[in-house]
Amino acid sequence: MTRRTTDQTDRTDQTDRTNPTGRTDQPPRPSAAAKPVRWAAEAVAAAPDAVRPHLDHSAPSLWRVDRMIEELRREGPPYNAVANVLRGLGSYAGEVIVRQTGAEWWGSAGDHWVRTPDGRLWEPLDEARRCFGGHGSLRLLCRDATRGKR
């Protein structure tokens, strides 16, 4: 009989959590979600009238978010001019992942991630910045996060 081992993502040990930069985080607290949830709500409120009804926190709604970011990029504004918009749209994508998978927001030193139940960390705010640079997709990030560990 062989002994089953678990990898790091299967552990529920609260003392051995590190973020993507290698720093140890405290166990998640509900307050870690406060800012991203607010940023997501602000992004939905600021969305064009034709788009707002479609931002229903469903995975398909992220297609529209990707298109919004693509349109921003085509307009050519400097990053600093759209940084808060991108933060809000990334937070919206994170909220979609949270609602679809039962994930939790994690935060440390001003950075925010989503931790899915399988233990993986996702960076939707960074993915929104990559989308603006032409190298990412919030829709695909959500697809990968909701598929679970393979």
Predicted feature residues:
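Long, intrinsically disordered low-complexity tandem-repeat segments
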Residues: 6-24
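A recognition module on extended beta-rich or small alphabeta surfaces enriched in W/G with H and D/E
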Residues: 114-150
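Intrinsic-disorder-associated interaction segments
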Residues: 29, 33, 37, 54, ...
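N-terminal intrinsically disordered, low-complexity segments enriched in P/E/S/T
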Residues: 3, 21-54
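Acidic, serine/threonine-rich, charge-biased low-complexity segments
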Residues: 1-7, 48-52, 71, 139, ...
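Exposed alpha-helical structural elements
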Residues: 35, 39-42, 60, 64-67, ...
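An N-terminal amphipathic alpha-helical segment
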Residues: 46-74
